[in-house]
Every structure is written in structure tokens, then in C-alpha cells.
């Protein structure tokens, strides 16, 4: 009995807690990643004691606001796959370099030590992956054993190497569906009312979301008739000529524009003077800018819409493939952590990405 008790004590001493946090803009399926992280962790009772979630992302660690997920019901955890948004709260907070703000990293390790956390899973985009890597570095310098893994999430689909990123598929489906439905509306009213419809979508540097509007096309003359990508310089004259020609030919024109399109000088055409927590220029206003051009230069009645939060929170229209990917990265993040992988980010790849469906 004494021996068994000693063994139990030693095993419990080896067990560590896992800290999971969500970061950046949320998606229709990010909670579908959180659920598998929690359930998969339970399959490793000898290595993992509890799963803590950060309240409002990494701020939950810095402010020592940890959510003990073991207190949540099984029904609640299972329901996460159906909930859009970030159930534990997210944040836009970028840790500076270790040299610039060593104290913040030391604070993280201090909190992790206090709560016996040995695994850190950070669910976000490029900046979040960078943060996870930096934390893995500082933990080694501070001689604190901590396994750090970045779990991919971004609607922009701009993470390197990966074929597709959890969050994108659902936005692509929403945008394509919305464009198709809105175009039928405009087509119905073209004779005596609206001639041009402009839909602004997310995508600062990557045009994946805007390009997904093309999925609405089934025939040659179907909308969208114009797609504006951030990778290509915006040519005002060419844009107006194409709108004019399309309206003359079809009676209406539908445009899908990325928020990140730039002018000839390389500046965002909708850039404001403010910046977000990551230092990125705040964008927004591409659609009204284009609408004003159409009104003033072509004198055509038009309407515009900004998909904004709607595109990334539309769980009712989520992609099943996207959902499966989101669940898989959560599950495998835990498995890879148990295998000792550290300072890495999960990526989804396939031999034939074009065979995959949204």
C-alpha cells in the first residue's frame, strides 16, 4: 500500500496542466478546435491533469484569468462544434520581442509555474504562431519545461505551406453563397433600379476570400463579374471601363472586392490613420470608395455591402470540410504535444489539394 501510494504521488507529480488560448479574429469553427483539445487531453491522464482555457486569449495568462474546463459539462464541450465566435474570449494582443519586453514573457512563465502548466496550445494565425515560438524559446532560457504548439486558424487562409486553414472554408462558402443570392436580387431589379452591387470582404494581403466569390459562377455571364484582389494593383480606369461594359452587356454588374486592394503607389485605398494591436493599418471602406466612383464617374445606381463579421461568424452556413479540419488540428495538437514536439505549428496538407471540396 505504501509503495502504491508513492507511485501514485510520483505519477501525479509528473502530470502537468494544459493551457489553451484563442487569438485574433474568431471564426465559425474555432470552437470546433477547442472541443477536441479538451476531449483529446482526457485520453492522456498520465501526462495531463487539467485543461485551462485563457479568458480572452493570451491575456488570460498574463492576467491570471484561467478557465478550468473540467468544471464544464460534457454537453457543453460537445456543443462547442456548433458555436461560432470564441467561447473563451479572444484578443488582438501581440507580444513584443523577448529583447523588447522580457518582463511580459517572464510573467507568462510565472503564471504557468504557479498553475503547473506544462503544455501551451495557442490557436490563431501568423502572429499567434510567432508568439507560441517565442514562448517556447524563453521557457528554455528560463529552464522551465514547457511544450508550445501553434494551432492554425485564420479566415484569410494566408498561413505558409498549408493547403487550407481552418476558418477559411466556411468564409469561402458564405461569400460564394451571398454573392450568388445578392446577384439574383440585383438581376431582378436591373431594369429600373440598381445596376451595380459591390461586396467588400476580408483579406488584407491575401485574396483567397475575394477569389472564393468565383465559386458562385455556374455559367459564363454569372456574377461576380469583377473580383478585386490585394495581390493586384487597382486600376481605376480599367475597373470603371469593365463595370460600364458589363452593365451595357448584361444590364447589371456584381463586384467582390478585398479590403486590402492598393493603388498605384502601393497604398491601401481604404487605409485609415489608426492601427490595431498588431501594428496593422486599420482597413475598411473599400466598398463605399468604389461605389462613389461608380456614382460619380458612371452615374449608375448602386448598392454596396461589407460582409465584415457576418462572413466569419456564419456557423449556419459553415463548410463541413472546414469543420473537420478544425476538429483535426485540435486533436492532433494534443497528440503532438504528447510526442514531445515543441515550437511547431500544425499544417494541413494533401497530395491533391484541388480534389478537396469546400
Question: What do the PLM-derived regions correspond to, one by one?
Answer:
Residues 15-65:
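N-terminal phosphate-binding or glycine-rich loops at protein starts, especially the Walker A/P-loop
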Residues 17-27, 87-92, 118-124, 150, ...:
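Short glycine-rich or small-residue beta-strand-to-loop segments that form or flank ligand, phosphate
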Residues 23-25, 54-59, 92-93, 125-126, ...:
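Short, ordered loop/turn segments at secondary-structure junctions
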Residues 35-43, 67-73, 134-147, 165-170, ...:
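A glycine- and small-aliphatic-rich helix-loop capping segment at beta-alpha/alpha-beta transitions
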Residues 65-117, 127:
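Glycine-rich oxoanion-binding loops at beta->alpha junctions
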Residues 122-124, 130-139, 165-303:
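Accessory alpha-helical/coil subdomains and C-terminal extensions
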Residues 277, 282-289, 295-346:
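C-terminal catalytic subdomain
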Residues 348-358:
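Single conserved hydrophobic/aromatic residue that forms the stacking wall/gate
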Amino acid at each position: 500500500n505504501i509503495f502504491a501510494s508513492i507511485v501514485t504521488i510520483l505519477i501525479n507529480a509528473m502530470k502537468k496542466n494544459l493551457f489553451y488560448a484563442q487569438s485574433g479574429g474568431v471564426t465559425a469553427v474555432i470552437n470546433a478546435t477547442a472541443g477536441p483539445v479538451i476531449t483529446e487531453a482526457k485520453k492522456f491522464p498520465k501526462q495531463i491533469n487539467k485543461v485551462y482555457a485563457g479568458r480572452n486569449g493570451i491575456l488570460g495568462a498574463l492576467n491570471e484569468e484561467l478557465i478550468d474546463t473540467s468544471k464544464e459539462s460534457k454537453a457543453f464541450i460537445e456543443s462547442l462544434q456548433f458555436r461560432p465566435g470564441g467561447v473563451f474570449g479572444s484578443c488582438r494582443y501581440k507580444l513584443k520581442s523577448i529583447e523588447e519586453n522580457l518582463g511580459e514573457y517572464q510573467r507568462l512563465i510565472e503564471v504557468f509555474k504557479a498553475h503547473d502548466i506544462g503544455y501551451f496550445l495557442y490557436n490563431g494565425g501568423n502572429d499567434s504562431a510567432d508568439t507560441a515560438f517565442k514562448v517556447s524559446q524563453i521557457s528554455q532560457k528560463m529552464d522551465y519545461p514547457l511544450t508550445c504548439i501553434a494551432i492554425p486558424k485564420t479566415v484569410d487562409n494566408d498561413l505558409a505551406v498549408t493547403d487550407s486553414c481552418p476558418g477559411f472554408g466556411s468564409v469561402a462558402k458564405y461569400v460564394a453563397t451571398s454573392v450568388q443570392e445578392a446577384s439574383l436580387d440585383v438581376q431582378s431589379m436591373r431594369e429600373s433600379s440598381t445596376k451595380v452591387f459591390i461586396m467588400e470582404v476580408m483579406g488584407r494581403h491575401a485574396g483567397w476570400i475575394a477569389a472564393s466569390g468565383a465559386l458562385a459562377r455556374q455559367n459564363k455571364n454569372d456574377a461576380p463579374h469583377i473580383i478585386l484582389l490585394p495581390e493586384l494593383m487597382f486600376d481605376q480606369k480599367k475597373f470603371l471601363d469593365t463595370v460600364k461594359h458589363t452593365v451595357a452587356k448584361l444590364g447589371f454588374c456584381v463586384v467582390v472586392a478585398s479590403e486590402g486592394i492598393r493603388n498605384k503607389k502601393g497604398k491601401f485605398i481604404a487605409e485609415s490613420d489608426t492601427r490595431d494591436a498588431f501594428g496593422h493599418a486599420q482597413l475598411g471602406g473599400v466598398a463605399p470608395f468604389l461605389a462613389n466612383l461608380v456614382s460619380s464617374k458612371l452615374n449608375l445606381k448602386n448598392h454596396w455591402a461589407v460582409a465584415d463579421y457576418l462572413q466569419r461568424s456564419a456557423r449556419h452556413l459553415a463548410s463541413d470540410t472546414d469543420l473537420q479540419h478544425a476538429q483535426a488540428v485540435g486533436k492532433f495538437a494534443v497528440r503532438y504535444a504528447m510526442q514531445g514536439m515543441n515550437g511547431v505549428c500544425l499544417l494541413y496538407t494533401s497530395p491533391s489539394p484541388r480534389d478537396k471540396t469546400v
